[in-house]
């Protein structure tokens, strides 16, 4: 058989792009789970634009998110966040990293469901605390008890995050490993193929 007669093996990335069509990929989850880092690398793999919703919100408002919280309050921020995410999804397809509270808004969840595939990057309490301690600009953690705040937010948000289309365990492994798991799981979800069995630490982390 000549080389020309051999079937062309499609790549996972090509399969995903074909199945996505005009839809985007939206990463949801708590602060510190790696939405921006993983999203940027996924976008590079898929050759899609990467967009960070928080960065877009700051650009639209002309001030940082801590400044928005301080001057106008969380309610004002959430309204602007919903508008920005709606605009970004209308311009898809992109890989979009959202803020930790964005998915809590029902209208935003509905818009994401209609225009994207959502991935919940799920991390446990200790992983989140280790990561968020590295940054001092988290408005919701400007309290006397940031650890208690993370516990409360996890309790409130995880049942809602679980409505995402897919769940991937965010843990302390190389970022490219998480990206590969996202790609494999996306391909299986979109194309109906059986994804490779996740390693034991993934299976236990997402239960």
UniProtKB/Swiss-Prot annotation:
It comes from the Bacteria. ATP binds at residues 32-37, 138. It is an enzyme of class 2 (transferase). Its EC number is 2.7.1.71. Pathway: Metabolic intermediate biosynthesis; chorismate biosynthesis; chorismate from D-erythrose 4-phosphate and phosphoenolpyruvate: step 5/7. Mg(2+) binds at residue 36. It holds the Pfam family SKI. HAMAP family: Shikimate_kinase. Belongs to the shikimate kinase family. Catalyzes the specific phosphorylation of the 3-hydroxyl group of shikimic acid using ATP as a cosubstrate. This is Shikimate kinase. It comes from Bradyrhizobium diazoefficiens (strain JCM 10833 / BCRC 13528 / IAM 13628 / NBRC 14792 / USDA 110).
């Amino acid at each position: 058989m000549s080389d020309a007669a051999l079937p062309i093996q499609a790549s996972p990335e090509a399969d995903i792009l074909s199945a996505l069509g005009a839809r985007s990929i939206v990463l949801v989850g708590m602060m510190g789970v790696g939405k921006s880092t993983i999203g940027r690398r996924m976008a590079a793999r898929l050759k899609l634009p990467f967009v960070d919703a928080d960065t877009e919100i700051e650009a639209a408002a002309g001030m940082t998110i801590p400044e928005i919280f301080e001057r106008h309050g969380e309610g004002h921020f959430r309204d602007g966040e919903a508008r920005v995410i709606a605009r970004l999804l209308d311009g898809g397809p992109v890989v979009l990293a959202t803020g930790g509270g964005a998915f809590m808004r029902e209208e935003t969840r509905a818009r994401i469901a209609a225009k994207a595939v959502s991935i919940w990057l799920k991390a446990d309490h200790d992983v989140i605390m280790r990561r968020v301690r590295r940054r001092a600009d988290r408005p919701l953690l400007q309290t006397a008890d940031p650890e208690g705040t993370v516990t409360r937010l996890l309790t409130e948000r995880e049942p809602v995050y679980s409505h995402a289309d897919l769940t991937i365990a965010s843990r302390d492994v190389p970022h490219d490993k998480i990206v590969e798991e996202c790609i494999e799981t996306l391909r299986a979800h979109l194309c109906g193929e059986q994804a490779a069995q996740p390693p034991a630490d993934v299976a236990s982390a997402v239960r």
